[in-house]
Every structure is written in C-alpha cells, then in structure tokens.
C-alpha cells in the first residue's frame, strides 16, 4: 500500500459506492463510482496506468476489463481495500 500511495505517476481509481468510501480511501485515490465509469472515460489518458480498487477486488476486476477493452492501461488491485 505504501508504494501505491507514494507513486504520483499512478492513477488510483476507487470505484466503491459513496457509502463505502466514507470508511476511508487510499491517499491520492480518485473516487469514481463503478456505474459512472463510462461517463468519465473522457478524463482517462491513454498510456498511463490506472489501478482500479473496490472493496474486495470483484467489481474492480470487471472495470479493469472494461477499461482494457477500451485500450487503457488498467490493473485490478487484487483483494481490494480488504487486502489492506
């Protein structure tokens, strides 16, 4: 987690619901709820890494696949926030 929070070149996208992020987020993460990802696609940049996180890694795996299908460099944070 410390590596993820200290690297300013990475984009951490927290896709959890509003009520879920009230318990805390990774430092530097941007909150974009899962269902609004398509509306925010224009803000993502090609060839930059995006690390997608949710509560347990299930929803983030789906969003990671969606972003990859649209040619973005996306990575699932396995285990999600529960892993931290």
Regions found by a protein language model. Give the residues of each.
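Rhodanese-like catalytic fold shared by cysteine-dependent sulfurtransferases
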Residues: 1-11, 17-49, 58-84
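Short, surface-exposed ligand- or partner-binding patches at beta-edge/loop junctions that are enriched
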Residues: 53
């Amino acid at each position: 987690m410390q590596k993820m929070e200290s690297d300013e070149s990475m984009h951490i996208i927290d896709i959890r619901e509003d009520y879920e992020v009230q318990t805390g987020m990774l430092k530097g993460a941007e909150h974009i709820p899962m269902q609004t990802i398509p509306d925010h696609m224009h803000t993502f940049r090609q060839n930059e890494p995006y690390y997608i996180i949710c509560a347990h890694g299930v929803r983030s795996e789906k969003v990671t696949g969606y972003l990859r299908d649209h040619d973005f460099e996306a990575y699932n944070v396995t285990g999600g926030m529960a892993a931290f």
